[in-house]
Amino acid sequence: MLGSAGTLLLLLLAWGARALSQPDDNRITTGRNQDLNAIQQDLLLKLLSGWTDSRESNLVEVERNVPDPPEPKIPPSVKFPRLSLRERKAPCKNFFWKTFTMC
C-alpha cells in the first residue's frame, strides 16, 4: 500500500527503534544515538510528507472526476398565481361562504 520506498522507510525506522531500545553495551555512544535519532526523525518526516502529498493528490484527482450536479430547472414562481382579487388581498384562510377571512 505504501510502496517500496515507504516499506523501506518503515523497516529502517523499526530497526532503529529496536536498536535504541536494547541496553547500551558501550557499542553505541551518545553521539551516535543522537545521529540515529536525527536520521529516524528525517525518515519519519519524509515518510509522512510523502504520504500526505499522495493523499492530497488523490483528493484533487477525485475532485476532478466528480461531475458538477445539474442545476434544477424550476420555472420562476409568480407571486400570486391566478388567484381571485379577494384571495390576493387577503391570502388567508377563508371561513364560511362570503363572510370573513381569518389570518
Curated annotation (Swiss-Prot):
Molecular function GO labels: G protein-coupled receptor binding; neuropeptide hormone activity
Pfam families registered for this protein in UniProt: Somatostatin
Entry's Gene Ontology BP terms: adenylate cyclase-inhibiting G protein-coupled receptor signaling pathway; regulation of cell migration
Keyword field: Cleavage on pair of basic residues, Disulfide bond, Hormone, Secreted, Signal
TM regions (residue ranges): none
One Gene Ontology cellular component: extracellular space
InterPro entries: Somatostatin, Somatostatin/Cortistatin_C
Disulfide bonds: 92-103
Cell inner membrane recorded as keyword: no
Signal peptide: 1-21
Keyword Signal: yes
Residues of the propeptide: 22-87
Localization (cell): Secreted
PANTHER family linked to this entry: CORTISTATIN, SOMATOSTATIN
Record function comment: Somatostatin inhibits the release of somatotropin.
Protein family according to the UniProt entry: Belongs to the somatostatin family.
Name of the protein in its database record: Somatostatin-2
Organism: Pelophylax ridibundus
